[in-house]
């Protein structure tokens, strides 16, 4: 699957704000726009409820961006569009970095890993009356 647009890094995606005298993190306008763009482009597949692996090719506008800064944003977007149940179930990420000044994007594949926990989670959600995609 391909998602077009420059992935904001974690460090550029959040800003510190003060709420009732305490510091907190808030999403930047750039990150909010990227999440909305990701959701519009994402083609729905069955939701992965347990462990998974991801292969991702990241095409940045320049060589200045780094891979590790984009993983949180990418996994959070997958969770937000309900491609995955929770990013904590990510067991492996295989990533490659490229530069494409004119067409920044993500190209990725998500694989469910074979585990019995997967079926346990599905059955638990069904028992709780939650909708589960098959």
Show which residues each predicted segment covers.
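Acidic, proline/glycine-enriched N-terminal capping motif
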Residues: 1-134
């Amino acid at each position: 699957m391909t998602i077009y647009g420059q992935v904001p890094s974690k460090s550029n995606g959040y800003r510190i704000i003060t709420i009732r005298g305490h510091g907190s993190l808030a999403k930047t306008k750039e990150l909010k726009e990227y999440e909305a763009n990701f959701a519009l482009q994402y083609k729905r597949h069955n939701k992965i409820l347990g462990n998974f692996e991801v292969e991702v090719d990241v095409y940045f506008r320049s060589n200045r961006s780094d891979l590790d800064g984009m993983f949180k944003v990418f996994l959070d977007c997958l969770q937000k569009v309900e491609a995955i149940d929770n990013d904590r179930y990510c067991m492996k990420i295989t990533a490659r970095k490229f530069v494409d000044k004119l067409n920044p994007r993500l190209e990725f594949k998500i694989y469910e890993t074979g585990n019995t926990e997967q079926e346990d989670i599905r059955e638990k959600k069904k028992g709780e009356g939650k909708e589960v995609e098959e």
